[in-house]
């Protein structure tokens, strides 16, 4: 959430940041709300000071021997009660305006960091580096073709069970999915991450705190009879793991890794990636998440990105790192690196991880703080990154490992988990 103080003191900075995202927002109504709140606060403080003064005066007169039921005392108490009523009215007005202000601020995205890569859309993103040698060839198949030949999954029966964009994995694919999850968790735990297994259902406050609500309500699955939603990513419950807390500075950074099923409605993606594992309503993902001090969050983004890259390197999958421009940033992010894995069957790079520094955006929405060196409460910075999306990783393994005899060579790092170095036709 954008800092209200910034809205009052430097609205031009907000306007410029939003414009760099391609948004032209009239901040006038928001500034009016801030001005009204400031005036009401001053008025309330003045009235409360008067009320306190009257209370002291009543106490002094009673000490001097004036009877409790004297006319003078009664008049003072009447005046004091009138002030209390006025204060109550002002507080209700403040609450109403504050709610309206928050409703609008919650719909504004994070501001890009200073000196960001300017751009309108993904065409303006910048490739930073590559790893591995992409293979190519006219006879290479896409992962869904390979899966059908090896009988790895069934999407048709899954649409009977649920609807389209669901898949049921069988035998080797189910085992490979499980192997990838355990491999990724173990790799990150060795790097010092603390494993957590969060709930797959989250409440509205959790989705609001991480930035999914209210903007993206249509993108998530909601339970009909409860204030619960299926989580779109483990980022949501991990953000709320410390909601409303003050985390001791000596515990920072907190680094979590979590496996979770993820659920997304994929509204607006009709007709795109209808086959295979690229765009499903339900998929598994291993998520990396940091709670960092503000001064270390830039370095933390480089580290979390490196940790996500290490998974691809261990799995021998070629990839590239892309810095997103301001117009392509996610809602909660102020800076993002995407990792795109090479899919030779499709002859393209596809996003497999997105690593973002959210600054204090989520921490402000979720009230997550620490103390600075002067013992003053300050907001933390949060960072997240996929480490990795399991289905897309499996797709990359199938396409990059395909052999002329129809078998699939598996990465050496998976052999201890899968128990074999190949997938073979049966």
UniProtKB/Swiss-Prot annotation:
It is an enzyme of class 6 (ligase). One of its GO terms (biological process) is seryl-tRNA aminoacylation. Its EC number is 6.1.1.11. It is found in: Cytoplasm. Keywords: Aminoacyl-tRNA synthetase, ATP-binding, Cytoplasm, Ligase, Nucleotide-binding, Protein biosynthesis. One of its GO terms (molecular function) is ATP binding. InterPro entries: aa-tRNA-synt_IIb, aa-tRNA-synth_II, aa-tRNA-synth_II/BPL/LPL, Ser-tRNA-ligase_type_1, Ser-tRNA-synth_1_N, SerRS_1_N_sf, SerRS_core, tRNA-bd_arm. It catalyses: tRNA(Ser) + L-serine + ATP = L-seryl-tRNA(Ser) + AMP + diphosphate + H(+); tRNA(Sec) + L-serine + ATP = L-seryl-tRNA(Sec) + AMP + diphosphate + H(+). The keyword Signal does not apply. Belongs to the class-II aminoacyl-tRNA synthetase family. Type-1 seryl-tRNA synthetase subfamily. Catalyzes the attachment of serine to tRNA(Ser). Is also able to aminoacylate tRNA(Sec) with serine, to form the misacylated tRNA L-seryl-tRNA(Sec), which will be further converted into selenocysteinyl-tRNA(Sec). HAMAP family: Ser_tRNA_synth_type1. Consists of two distinct domains, a catalytic core and a N-terminal extension that is involved in tRNA binding. This is Serine--tRNA ligase. The lineage of its organism: Bacteria, Bacillati, Cyanobacteriota, Cyanophyceae, Synechococcales. The gene is serS.
